[in-house]
Amino acid sequence: MALNYKPLWIQLAKKGLKKTDVIAMAGLTTNVMAQMGKDKPITFKNLERICKALSCTPNDIISFEDNYVEKVNV
């Protein structure tokens, strides 16, 4: 997947926070955090909650890496 949450994990390390801290601060479920750990999509609402809890923007949480290769049926 081209989108990932690497910037979020860096933010957490810099702030000395754990994933469980973000779950509590943002009111997330453990399933949401598990999805993020697998670089799976989350809802905009959950993204907004994380941004508010960490006082940041989506750019501080998500990065785009253009290494996605699309399968083409030949």
Put a short name on every predicted segment.
Residues D39-K52:
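Short, basic-rich loop-to-helix N-cap that marks the start of a DNA-contacting helix
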Residues D21, V32, D60:
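Residues in the helix-turn-helix
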Residues A2, I10-Q11, I62-V74:
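Short, charged recognition helix plus adjacent turn
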Residues L28-I42:
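Recognition helix of helix-turn-helix/homeodomain-like DNA-binding domains
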Residues K6-M25:
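Short basic helix-loop element that most often maps to the first helix and adjoining turn
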Residues A13, G27, K38, D66:
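Residue-level detection of the helix-turn-helix DNA-binding "recognition helix"
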